[in-house]
Amino acid sequence: MRLTAKQVIWLKVCLHLAGLLPFLWLVWAINHGGLGADPVKDIQHFTGRTALKFLLAALLITPLARYAKQQLLIRTRRLLGLWCFAWATLHLTSYALLELGVNNLALLGKELITRPYLTLGIISWVILLALAFTSTQSMQRKLGKHWQQLHNFVYLVAILAPIHYLWSVKIISPQPLIYAGLAVLLLALRYKKLLSLFNRLRKQAHNKLSL
């Protein structure tokens, strides 16, 4: 059975709740002692994992819509991407304010440069910022063919974000490995497109070097 436009609207409502409820839980946990012995780290990891979940969900939409023949599912992709950016912003903010502190924000730039896993994280966040800012239909029309070129960078985020997560934990546990494995699987479903993008970039680089 094909999804109707009305059903997609209700699906979006559910996805908004899926983005909001973890935040409400986090607020409750902070105020009622629901976090672990290191609440700052717990907040950072929770916000980062939630951002990664929405990233993977957004990447799942296209192959799911194709294989299930539910093209209206594509309408939920932007929503998932925006929630990914929102949670990634909370993740960055929690590190800046809770780990470094308001009085040490001047150290943020140095930290992002000197710690490789933070460098990967901030690169991912900047890409997500650009994708969120240009996610509207008006920006899509304004950018034309460059819009898709820009939004292909989501695949780079799908590589960098799991590495950032794996690199940030002191002890490798199954959880970050599962996220990394899911990211690899979702990218593998697009291997033809990714191979085409790689060959195009290599050709462009070769042409520039030949000038």
Curated annotation (Swiss-Prot):
Protein topology in the membrane: Multi-pass membrane protein
BP GO terms, sorted: protein repair
One annotated Gene Ontology cellular component of this protein: plasma membrane
Protein localization: Cell inner membrane
Single annotated GO MF: metal ion binding
Primary location: membrane
Key words, A-Z: Cell inner membrane, Cell membrane, Electron transport, Flavoprotein, FMN, Heme, Iron, Membrane, Metal-binding, Transmembrane, Transmembrane helix, Transport
Cofactor(s) this protein cannot do without: FMN; heme b
Classification via InterPro entries: Fe3_Rdtase_TM_dom, MsrQ-like
Pfam families named in the record: Ferric_reduct (PF01794)
Transmembrane segments: 8-28, 82-102, 116-136, 153-173, 178-198
Cofactor binding description: Binds 1 FMN per subunit. Binds 1 heme b (iron(II)-protoporphyrin IX) group per subunit.
Quaternary context: Heterodimer of a catalytic subunit (MsrP) and a heme-binding subunit (MsrQ).
PANTHER family named among the record's database cross-references: PROTEIN-METHIONINE-SULFOXIDE REDUCTASE HEME-BINDING SUBUNIT MSRQ
Record-linked HAMAP family: MsrQ
Family: Belongs to the MsrQ family.
Record function comment: Part of the MsrPQ system that repairs oxidized periplasmic proteins containing methionine sulfoxide residues (Met-O), using respiratory chain electrons. Thus protects these proteins from oxidative-stress damage caused by reactive species of oxygen and chlorine generated by the host defense mechanisms. MsrPQ is essential for the maintenance of envelope integrity under bleach stress, rescuing a wide series of structurally unrelated periplasmic proteins from methionine oxidation, including the primary periplasmic chaperone SurA and the lipoprotein Pal.
Protein name in UniProt: Protein-methionine-sulfoxide reductase heme-binding subunit MsrQ
Lineage of the species this protein comes from: Bacteria, Pseudomonadati, Pseudomonadota, Gammaproteobacteria, Enterobacterales
Gene: msrQ
